[in-house]
């Protein structure tokens, strides 16, 4: 199984590691699996599909409809990371068709939960509060992500490994759409702070507007369903984990914030 990925913050100015890890790395793995006739599962991202319009029915959103990504959505990556992930997906598909590689692919929405690197949006804001740093909201905070707890992602991958049809792509999501502004305000509320105690910083370059997953194929064909469907509770549990495991993230914090500061974030 391939879950390879690289943290984005340090690589904005040098995208080559994306190419080497996601393309060359995937090639090495699928060639080894082909040679030794090993079952392979490729973990990918919904970012390969680009982004979707903002929805009218979410607070502060635009004029878009509630469309979602499916396995039939054309690839339209918009960043060095997502373009190389799309390339790695296509390598796997080609090896399945050309060489009979026994493989499946999953494309998942944004994860949250314990052990997530503090560069990422949710743990960054949690550890900012814990470190006495003002949380940072990128741009206006309208960007929407379809959040899924890491335990649900793991259970979905296991379901695909044990029940999935070879050659198929399954999208993993938990119907957890929230905009960044709502998420940061909820974090502050759950941590006993004023929900407006954050500052706006520069938006990310090429920041995709909205991701949303249609996971009906995974649910209907393989019988999977998410267990962590209460985002508020899942976020509270995640906050508690970072509170209780400061030694895991504390040494990284200064470097992460210094790197963000270079980009005005």
Region spans (language model):
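N-terminal Rossmann-like NAD(P)+-binding domain of SDR-like oxidoreductases, especially those catalyzing
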Residues: 1-111, 236-245, 251, 255-265
């Amino acid at each position: 199984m391939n879950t390879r990925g690289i943290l984005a913050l340090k690589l904005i100015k040098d995208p080559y590691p994306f190419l080497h890890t996601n393309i060359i790395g995937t090639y090495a793995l699928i060639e080894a699996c082909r040679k030794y006739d090993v079952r392979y599962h490729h973990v990918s991202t919904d970012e390969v599909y680009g982004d979707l319009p903002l929805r009218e029915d979410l607070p502060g959103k635009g004029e878009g409809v509630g469309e979602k990504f499916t396995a039939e959505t054309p690839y339209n990556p918009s960043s060095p990371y997502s373009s190389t992930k799309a390339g790695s997906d296509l390598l796997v598909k080609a090896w399945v068709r050309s060489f009979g590689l026994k493989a499946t692919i999953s494309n998942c929405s944004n994860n949250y939960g314990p052990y997530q690197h503090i560069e990422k949006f949710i743990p960054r804001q949690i550890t900012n509060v814990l470190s006495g740093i003002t949380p940072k909201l990128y741009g206006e905070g309208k960007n929407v992500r379809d959040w899924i707890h890491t335990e649900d992602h793991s259970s979905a991958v296991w379901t695909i490994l044990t029940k999935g049809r070879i050659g198929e792509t399954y999208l993993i999501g938990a119907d957890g759409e929230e905009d960044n502004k709502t998420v940061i305000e909820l974090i502050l509320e759950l941590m006993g702070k004023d929900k407006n105690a954050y500052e706006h910083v520069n938006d990310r370059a090429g920041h995709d507007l909205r991701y949303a997953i249609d996971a009906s194929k995974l649910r209907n064909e393989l019988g999977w369903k998410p267990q962590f469907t209460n985002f508020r509770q899942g976020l509270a549990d995640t906050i508690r984990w970072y509170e209780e495991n400061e030694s895991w993230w504390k040494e990284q914090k200064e470097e992460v914030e210094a790197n963000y500061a270079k980009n005005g974030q």
